[in-house]
Design a protein with these regions (language model features):
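Glycine-rich, low-complexity segments
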Residues: 1-22, 106-108
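Extended Gly/Ser/Thr-rich low-complexity repeat segments
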Residues: 1-2, 48-62, 98-109
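Hydrophobic beta-strand residues in large extracellular and virion-surface proteins
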Residues: 12, 27-29, 39, 81, ...
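Beta-rich globular "head" domains
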Residues: 16-71
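Helix-rich interaction surfaces within compact, conserved domain-sized segments
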Residues: 67-109
């Protein structure tokens, strides 16, 4: 496989009341061979309190430092996420439980 071919997409194990929004695709993650992690899909209905865990990435997908990323909320605005070296993907701000989309979230590990 070349570096541009990502690993197979894996479904995220959602936590704190979040569920996959099947109309817009399950929340999933993948990684290229050169270490870029991609997230995609949409979830709904979960806890929106700051620092609430949405899901946890497996060890080989985790950043070495804390990252702050933007996802898309129900108002088509920026929802702020934290992605920790522990693998926890957490709510930071402007997250709406109606739905939360990860299609534009990526980072290098």
């Amino acid at each position: 496989k070349s570096e541009s071919n990502p690993t197979a997409w894996q479904n995220a194990n959602l936590q704190n009341g979040w569920s996959h929004h099947r109309d817009y695709g399950n929340v999933q993650f993948s990684k290229t061979f050169d270490g870029i992690v991609y997230l995609k899909g949409t979830c709904k209905g979960g806890k929106t309190t700051r620092e609430s865990i949405i899901f946890t990435l497996p060890e080989s997908f985790r950043p070495s430092t804390t990252l702050f990323k933007t996802a898309l909320n129900n108002d088509y605005g920026s929802a702020v996420l934290g992605i920790y070296p522990s693998g926890n993907v957490v709510v930071k701000g402007n997250v709406d439980a109606t739905w939360l989309n990860f299609d534009n979230v990526s980072f290098k590990i």
